[in-house]
Each structure stands twice: as structure tokens, then as C-alpha cells.
Regions:
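AAA+ P-loop NTPase catalytic core and its hallmark functional loops
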Residues: 1-194
Length: 194
């Protein structure tokens, strides 16, 4: 079995707050058992290099060859909970990785209610955090799967690299900024079919 090194996993073994429950893996019948996934030695080495350098891992290959399953396997292996998944689409932008703002819903609400919402209420009602936003706001390390980046617009990869490099984002609607520490840097797996 391949052995990975996330700083030899010592931080995770020593800190129970960084270990997420594994029930999500058994509750999702669509995914194969991540404990049974067996990466090649070359793939295990690529994972170790990406983890050591703190950079995203880009996996390319034909549909069904196991790219997505690697993210599930890594989450299982490091006890990081269910991977946070972002499925790239033809209209995706880098901002979509962090959050979505329901501007129309907020507008409709403001037309029907005279009182202004508090930032917390605005966030609760009209902001939906996405995979990378959830990971950055998380108290522990997570696996983020950015699936099928080849389906996104041509400028998406450049915007994505910038977003992944900074691991911070602003929510101007709330006047808030979020960032993560190196200790909580998410394990990021990108997949592409081409």
C-alpha cells in the first residue's frame, strides 16, 4: 500500500480537532470504498511531492480512470472527512470556488422588508460557501476536489492558480475577508479529462 506523508501525519494524529468523522464515506453509495483504492507508486510519489510542496495536484486522464477516487482516498487516508467538491462548468469563475451570493434573493427581500439585515443574517440567508471557501473557513485541514477543470472557461485556470496561491478571499457583500494558515492549508486535487 502506498504511504503518504503529510508532515508524516504527526500533526493530525496528535490533534483530534483535525480528524473528521469517516461516516460520510460509508454513507455515499456512489463512491467506491476509498480504503480499497491502490495508487501506483508513481502516483503516490506525485501525491507526496504535492503535499510536501503545498501545491495542488493536477490529475489528467480518461473519464473513469480513478482521478476523483484519489481525492476520496486521500481524505480517508488522512482522516480529513468527506472531500469538498467543486464541479467546474462552462460558466465557472474563480470566485465560484469560494462562495455564491444570491443577489436576486437579497434584492427581493429588501423590496419586501424595510429593516436592513445584520451581516450575520445576510450571510445566513444569501451567502452559500463553496468547496474552497468552506475549506478556508474550516478549523482543520480538508481535501478539496476541483473536478473537470477542462470544462471551465479558458481564463479559469489562471484565475484558479492565483486563488489557490493566496488561499484567501473577500466577501464584499459582508465586508469580510477570510484566509487560512499553512497548518490548515487544504489538500487540493484538480482533475481534467484532457
Amino acid at each position: 500500500m502506498a504511504q503518504y506523508s503529510l508532515e508524516k501525519c504527526a500533526e493530525f494524529a496528535a490533534n483530534p480537532h483535525l480528524r473528521a468523522p469517516l461516516s460520510a464515506f460509508t454513507a455515499n453509495p456512489r463512491m467506491r470504498d476509498p480504503a480499497l483504492y491502490r495508487p501506483s507508486p508513481e502516483l503516490a510519489e506525485a501525491v507526496n511531492v504535492a503535499l510536501h510542496l503545498g501545491i495542488p495536484l493536477l490529475l489528467t486522464g480518461e473519464p473513469g480512470c480513478g482521478k476523483t477516487e484519489l481525492a476520496w482516498h486521500l481524505a480517508w487516508y488522512f482522516h480529513l472527512g468527506e472531500p469538498l467538491v467543486f464541479n467546474a462548468k462552462s460558466g465557472s469563475s474563480a470566485t465560484d470556488l469560494f462562495y455564491q451570493y444570491d443577489a436576486l434573493g437579497h434584492f427581493q427581500y429588501s423590496q419586501n422588508h424595510a429593516e436592513a439585515l445584520s451581516p450575520d443574517e445576510l450571510e445566513r440567508r444569501f451567502i452559500c460557501y463553496q468547496a474552497l471557501g468552506v475549506a478556508i473557513r474550516s478549523d482543520g485541514r480538508r481535501v478539496v476536489l476541483i473536478d473537470e477543470v477542462d470544462k471551465a472557461p479558458r481564463d479559469f485556470p489562471n484565475d484558479l492558480l492565483d486563488a489557490l496561491d493566496k488561499l484567501r478571499f473577500d466577501v464584499p457583500e459582508l465586508g469580510k475577508s477570510y484566509h487560512t494558515s499553512d497548518a490548515n492549508r487544504p489538500v487540493i486535487v484538480l482533475t481534467s479529462n484532457s
